[in-house]
Each structure stands twice: as structure tokens, then as C-alpha cells.
Amino acid sequence: MKISITENLSKLPLPATEKWPEGVFDIEAFKHGSMSLILFAPVGNDYQTPHSQDELYIVIEGSGVLIREGKEFPFKPGDALFVKAGEQHRFSQFEKGLKMWAVFWGKEGGEKNA
């Protein structure tokens, strides 16, 4: 199976909502079982709230800073960023044109350390 970034980008932005007043800049590109693949291409501000599953962001284009639980993690293309289920996080200081895949998986509340 192939999932196209170009095809999914063409569907963005989705209409604005109360939570995302500048429009919704993520779309589910694929789902299988508990795993979902989201294309995230924010514009303006990032209004995310904690998620119920663990997530892995893979940066395709652009740079910025992930703020996770108050700590800053600068990122650039090719980087992968992990956020545990329930953690406060958002993206800041990101370049116009930021694009990343976000992979959500596992049970509600996230995986436990082995």
C-alpha cells in the first residue's frame, strides 16, 4: 500500500472549528487497527491538546520546536519526535510549510515501559 503526501495535502485545510479557528491542518491518511497515520501541516498556531494514544512525529519538511511537558526540543527534516499518551505538547516557532507524519498507536493511555 502507498500513501501519498501530495494527495493528502490537497485536502487541507479542512474547515475551521472552535478549537482550530485558522482551519484544521491534519488529516487521517490511513488507519489499521489501533494505528492511524495523520498528515500534520500546521499554519499559524498549534492548538493541540493531549492525545489518548502514544504518538510518533516524523518531520518531512520544515523546522521548529516541540514543547513537550515544558521542555523544548528543536527539530528539522528527518527527525522523529515521540510524545507519550496524555502528555501536554505543541509545536512552536515552526516554519511556513512544516509537514510531518504523525503515527498514533496502541491502547488508550499508551504503552507501558518494558
Indicate residue ranges for each PLM-predicted region.
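Short acidic-glycine-tyrosine-enriched beta hairpin
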Residues: 70-85
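A short, N-terminal "cap"/entry segment at the start of jelly-roll beta-barrel domains
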Residues: 1-39, 44-48
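Short histidine-centered beta-strand/loop micro-motifs
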Residues: 27-29, 46-51, 68, 92-93, ...
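Ligand-binding loop in jelly-roll beta-barrel domains
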Residues: 85-111
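Short hydrophobic/aromatic-rich beta-strand segments that constitute the beta-sheet cores
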Residues: 37-39, 66-68, 100
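A generic "binding-loop/recognition-motif" signal
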Residues: 33, 43, 71, 87, ...
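Short, conserved beta-strand element in jelly-roll/cupin
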Residues: 51-66
